Amino acid sequence: MKASLPWSVVWRAQSNYVRLRRVLKLCELWLLLVGSGLNAKLPLEEDVDFINEYVGLHNELRGTVFPPGVNLRFMTWDVALSRTARAWGKKCMYSRNTHLDKLHESHPVFTEIGENMWVGPVEDFTVTTAIRSWHEERKSYSYLNDTCVEDQNCSHYIQLVWDSSYKVGCAVTSCARAGGFTHAALFICNYAPGGTLTRRPYQAGQFCSRCGPGDQCTDYLCSNTVRDEATYYQFWYPPWEKPRPVVCNPMCIFILFLRVASLLLCVIVVLIVQSRFPVILMETPTIISAEEEGKTEVEIVMEEGEGEGEGGEGEGEGEEKEEEEMLEEDEQ
């Protein structure tokens, strides 16, 4: 017979095996994260330096269009547009956002939203690389004929220099695979109002010569302090975003306040009632004499039976007296 190992030795071996498996799982998870590009230091959509970089580059390229534009607007950042870009980027789909044409699904105010997308390896991504690649499409676009070279795409450039657009929001997302790239970066910018392909992107002429009322010329673009003011939509997020950020809007805050107030009111009422009626929840004690305590249950039952019998006899005597009185009245 083979000698069996002590149980303590077996238990330690199994415990070490379980620990080793856990370590291997953690290493595997770490490798997956590295492989998917999640460790890449891509900026968040509300990072100030990131915002200043892409907004500044948009305005720089818009202010140097050729031929010059008479009415191109100055661009400023919009948080709702950047949230929409982030939400669609999380899907890692290098295709047009299907929610852009649906009312208030891409912005709480604007109804016409434009979009530009760039995809490439994570290590190749920079804001300048992505946006200038859209600007390079101008080489395939003829402003005079309002046409694009056959088999070429000019839509990114047209949106980039669309005259009526003045709000922009961008986001970059790391994807395991997107647009034919592995370990990809998906960069999306949304614009409001969005551009179309129904006309030239702007009117040619002297810079800022046809700005609107109240506008001023800033870096060869039409700016307006009221129009360019930043609006922070605190409680708005794309309704189709998954997983959705946890947000408590004014109605949620009101309901929470109402519940807390109701709870406090109930506590106050209970305290007032208890202070005015201190014995309201106390049971009234039943006083039992020493003689009754000494009696057995059988004796108590017998006494109750005798009482009922006496009551029955009393009722019988009363009925006989009533019958005698009735007979005497009949005789009279």
From Swiss-Prot:
Query: Which positions fall inside the SCP domain?
Result: 57-191
Q: Which residues are glycosylated?
A: N145
- Bilayer topology annotation: Single-pass membrane protein
Q: Does the keyword Transmembrane helix apply?
A: yes
Q: Where are the membrane-spanning stretches?
A: 253-273
* Major subcellular site: membrane
Q: Where is this region: Disordered?
A: 293-332
The text of the family note is:
Belongs to the CRISP family.
Specify the protein name.
Answer: GLIPR1-like protein 2
